[in-house]
């Protein structure tokens, strides 16, 4: 499956040219933003880790081995990509134990930048946001056109698609999810089950968002929409008054789409009809998610780009800096600008 099938149409028109992303790890930098004051005491050792050429799970295994503890005692807030320079927090549960020597975990691919104690472990999804610094190299596009589109994106946001990398190479994760859904069965391995259920939900969300992008309503509240604030998981239904809420215009409040689970779409009016039609087309996937015990949640359709700045270090290099809420994809922004040219034989651009 191609990117258009897995995501949907662009919001701002065709790509303005092409570029390479991640020719080196430094071209894709991610800093986890964690709004948790650390107490300096407790049985959990929190580590601020810089890694390159190493994914989060591999880093956790290295830390566990060096600390002499079970992998189950090592926690992290979110998964970060292997092909990047990333900085993120880990925690290690060490009840009644002194800080271990973690030197064996460190080399040119992993550095521990800070270590401190806290009373609680790091929970999945605990980070508030991710800060990105991207360098698009071998840029073949008109700078004036890029600048104009970035100004529009800063003012209006972008469709909050799950990135193509969520679906695996050529959509392989989705193919696997459909296969399991056709049998209404679940993989026994927990990590495989979690990955494929997440893939199915992401695809259904993208389908609903694609329909809203196609009809031009992805950033407009309609009566029956379920609205949510950027950093909130709660939502409320829009009536006529809510559709003119000034917080919509300043990108604080947004229409949402379905993360499918038990029951019909809780949206109303035309929005309910659109989402239910999508669910009817993908009945096997929806029934599979319900059978797996997933509850219905919502995700904002429009993604505001925090602190967006850009410049050109060289005529053929575009550097972007911005902040996104946790769980959102930097490649969704890049996609609105240019087509990415694969580096060597690499087909997947990044994990955000």
From Swiss-Prot:
It catalyses: uridine(13) in tRNA = pseudouridine(13) in tRNA. One of its GO terms (biological process) is tRNA pseudouridine synthesis. SUPFAM superfamilies: Pseudouridine synthase. It is an enzyme of class 5 (isomerase). HAMAP family: TruD (MF_01082). Responsible for synthesis of pseudouridine from uracil-13 in transfer RNAs. This is tRNA pseudouridine synthase D. It comes from Pseudomonas fluorescens (strain ATCC BAA-477 / NRRL B-23932 / Pf-5).
